[in-house]
């Protein structure tokens, strides 16, 4: 059983970041090639200028860019050592806002290092992108994660990963934008941090 990793909270729900808290332009050149984003592309600090609740342990800075607390880092390091890079980020807020957020001892941007090719592309719907000049057809995942199908995890494969692009003749299938999590790790995160993850179970209606 596999889940699409998706924290419930992001900038604009329980908190709001200032305008300077953004990724350096150019980071998409790495995600497009299914490569980890170099640490130098991440902001060194985040400034919170509003808050309505305690800061969660896992959240989006913006869609697709995740931040973990020290507590969440410890769970990942225990269950999936070496599969995630944690890039420290300093968090700042005025005293009143900081009191609401109740900061943990440290926060980190998350670079998911795990890679595996587990999507069963021939059995699932896909979106077609413009054909390349060399005739290569590019296809990607639909947003309907209920229809995604994945093979079983092989021994030694990561518990949290980006799926590796797969080529079949002149067709190349791309699903690396999503972070996928094996059930055992997702359940551990959910147990430690209840109601912080959307239960987006792949392949089940």
PLM region descriptions:
Residues 1-205:
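Phosphate/anion-contacting hairpin/loop surfaces
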């Amino acid at each position: 059983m596999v889940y699409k990793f998706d924290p419930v909270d992001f900038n604009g729900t329980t908190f709001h970041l200032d305008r300077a808290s953004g990724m350096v332009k150019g980071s998409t050149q790495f995600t497009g090639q299914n490569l980890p984003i170099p640490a130098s592309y991440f902001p060194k600090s985040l400034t919170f200028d509003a808050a309505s609740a305690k800061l969660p342990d896992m959240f989006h800075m913006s869609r697709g860019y995740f931040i973990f607390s020290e507590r969440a880092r410890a769970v990942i390091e225990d269950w999936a050592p070496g599969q995630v890079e944690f890039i420290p980020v300093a968090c700042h807020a005025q005293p009143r806002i900081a009191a609401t957020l109740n900061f943990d001892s440290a926060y980190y941007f998350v670079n998911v290092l795990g890679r595996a090719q587990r999507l069963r592309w021939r059995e699932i719907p896909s979106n077609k992108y413009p054909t390349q000049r060399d005739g290569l057809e590019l296809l990607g995942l639909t947003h309907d994660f209920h229809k995604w199908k994945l093979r079983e995890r092989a021994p030694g494969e990561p518990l949290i990963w980006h799926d590796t692009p797969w080529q079949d003749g002149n067709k190349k299938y791309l699903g690396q934008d999503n972070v996928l999590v094996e059930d055992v790790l997702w359940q551990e995160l959910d147990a430690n941090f209840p109601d912080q993850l959307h239960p987006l179970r792949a392949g089940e209606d």
